[in-house]
Curated annotation (Swiss-Prot):
Catalytic activity: Release of the N-terminal residue from a tripeptide
Entry superkingdom: Bacteria
Protein name as it appears in the record: Peptidase T
Organism in which the protein naturally occurs: Alkaliphilus oremlandii (strain OhILAs) (Clostridium oremlandii (strain OhILAs))
SUPFAM superfamilies (alphabetical): Bacterial exopeptidase dimerisation domain (SSF55031), Zn-dependent exopeptidases (SSF53187)
Taxon lineage: Bacteria, Bacillati, Bacillota, Clostridia, Peptostreptococcales
Amino acid sequence: MKNMVQRFLKYVTIDTKSDHESESFPSTKSQFDLAKLLVEELKALGLEDAVMDENCYVMATLPSNCNTDKTIPTIGFIAHMDTSPDMSGKDVKPQMVENYDGQDIVLNQEKNIILSPTDFPDLKNYVGKTLITTDGTTLLGADNKAGIAEIISALEYLVQNPEVQHGTIKVAFTPDEEVGHGADRFDVEKFGADFAYTIDGGEIGELEYENFNAAGVKILVHGRNIHPGTAKNRMVNSMEIAMELHAMLPENQKPQYTEGYEGFFLLTGIRGDVEETKCGYIIRDHCKNKFEEKKSLIKNAVDFLNGKYGEGTINLTVTDNYFNMKEKIEPVMHIVETARTAMEEVGVTPIIKPIRGGTDGARLSFMGLPCPNIFTGGHNFHGKYEYICVESMYKATEVILKIIELYSK
């Protein structure tokens, strides 16, 4: 496991930012650069079947070394290669902060960018630890390159210590998770695991098997542009209708006012003029009934405004993206309980809470591969304040190894 940090630092220098607007798969060609490197590393470890397919999915197998009549499940571990489109992942310059003293960390002196425990109180949990931060100009990429490094380090340990008994282990690294397409072309049958874990969580101890139900909404508002000097009773301003629609959504159901199991509507983009306005929303809720109610609410608002301004004034498209994996995990709760036990046995306190987002595992669970989520040790994903604790990374690898051990007994 001693090579874990070096691996991680190498991975984050490869720009794998995905792209919401791209129509190709994967959405950016640069993801192939990391995928090719990972195949080389896996083969160097002796995983001879390591392969990258035409869609940029990397898969590999560590065969069982157990001599037993007991049926040992085939376990998968999964992480994604892309980084968020929300901020640049190019020319990442990670900074090491050893023996953190609990004070402000200057990420970028020239731009006065400070990582402060005043703004991010979780930093206080890492006094005396080693942190890896950004230089304030990019994200870090711990989401999810830390997960990749932790999985490969676990494989390296097993290869270098053949006396450690283990069943068949499958690993996969996926593209385009950050733009919601990580599971689109994932071949569950080819992967061949009985169940899996995504190593894609945040702070040390996170163990998650509930996530949002998610939908995307596209709104197109048609107006009528008339010279403002002669516009009386004739002009229809599409931007104002879009504003009216937005005002009909519950004010208290926005991300900035919600937490825990509370769902929300989020206006993700708006662009327009008098003649035409386009809006994008996302809808999220853990509860399936409340999720459906939210979709109905926005549909009813559109119907009302079409009645007010004329049929066809607003075009609405609602697309379900993924669903809460809880219903697929509960029948096989032993995979959560084993992960909980593994954490406790390596000295990590489990933090079981709902994901306020989604993972590849959410969709994979509905594709026949139950797949809860385990921490990486990172914080503040998707932005310049992202950081990760090295000691937490080692613990993540220990948890992976302990899960493997518990299932091989």
